Amino acid sequence: MSPNSKGVEILSIGTELLLGNIINTNAQWISEQLSQLGLNHFRQSTVGDNCDRIVRVIQEISKRSNLLITTGGLGPTPDDLTTEAIAKSFNVTLFERPHLWDEIKQKLPNSKLHEDSSSLRKQCFFPKNAQIINNPRGTAPGMIWEPIKGFTILTFPGVPSEMKTMWEETAYDFIQTKFSDTYSFFSNTLKFAGIGESSVAEKINDLLNLKNPTVAPYANLGEVKLRITARAKNEVEAKNIIKPIKEKLKQEFSKFIFGEDNDTLPSILIKELTKRKQTIVFAESCTGGLLSASLTSISGSSQVFQGSIVSYSNELKHLLLDISEEKLAKYGAVSEEVCEAMAINVKKKLRADWAISISGIAGPNGGSQNKPVGLVYISISGPNNYITTIKKQFNSTRNRLEIQTLSVNVCLNSLRLILLSDSK
């Protein structure tokens, strides 16, 4: 986009967004796409399903931007008002595109067409000169339309899978050709575990003021990310700009960096175990299967993950994991002694190379003075009778799911570090 351009705006339409019923992932995804295209994206708006309000917002945007991208409000229901509101904003008539009705009829069963033909048909009406954006995944097409000189509107349905497909198949090339200049933004994200955001930021203070590339830290629960973004003519040039900063960070934080971009702790652990042709099992108590779910959510986990025993009660710890009643009575389920026995025994029972066990108090109830909420024991059992136990005391003000999620991250990262040290 040229230096004199007014920029791009995103307009998200839907009362459900204002009520907080759904998270606006569409705007986030489109923002990333615009950044990759090197476009100036300065503002986002959200408006409910009210035609007059949508009209007012569109008219305001048309005075300050070159390109408007809308999501939501396309479809057959009475509250799908986007196309109607756009037409009203510029005082134009909507015309039916008969071929679109033919396409809708092919996508839906006859019974549905008979019941809702009039409401479904409203999806076929567009301004006279609008270019249609086909929707391979649904019935609601979008459009590319320039209602006034220097201002273009692209419309998409609110369903993320439909919007993304339409963007990738039609809109991306159009925007790149018409609006993108010779420079684009390229980002590379480094992911950290076992270190806090403030500790990372403190060590990279000199990098935070860079202009090209820029370096920005941000945190999710249990991990820190550093996004390095370069403005360049192509990806090769961008990689060359990013490379020295990336190498400096890897030297500074070697063991804390577990991956890049789309990597996750589960995917990295699966990769490392697959490389070694080793298997893993779990014995879970306070996480209730969350550790197992983190691994099985990744394609390819079956190559390394054998299974798990979720033994929430003391009775099942005794019956399924052979933890003696005497040990449970003496030390309690949340203890180093019981957690170690869980790891050793599940590894033996399920015949794996590695085992992780976890037992703790996730809260908000169940804590005591000696064993407060947030206390978690994690044991890792491995080849050659290897055993180690990690004791964590998470902040008791965290909610139950946060403590469980942080516990899972510690499990995965701890084994990652063990494998890393073993390979040296």
Swiss-Prot record:
InterPro entries: CinA, CinA-like_C, CinA_C, CinA_KH, Competence-induced_CinA, MoaB/Mog-like_dom_sf, MoaB/Mog_dom. Transmembrane segments: none annotated. It comes from the Bacteria. SMART domains: MoCF_biosynth. It holds the Pfam family CinA. Belongs to the CinA family. PANTHER family: NICOTINAMIDE-NUCLEOTIDE AMIDOHYDROLASE PNCC, NMN AMIDOHYDROLASE-LIKE PROTEIN YFAY. This is CinA-like protein. It comes from Prochlorococcus marinus (strain MIT 9301).
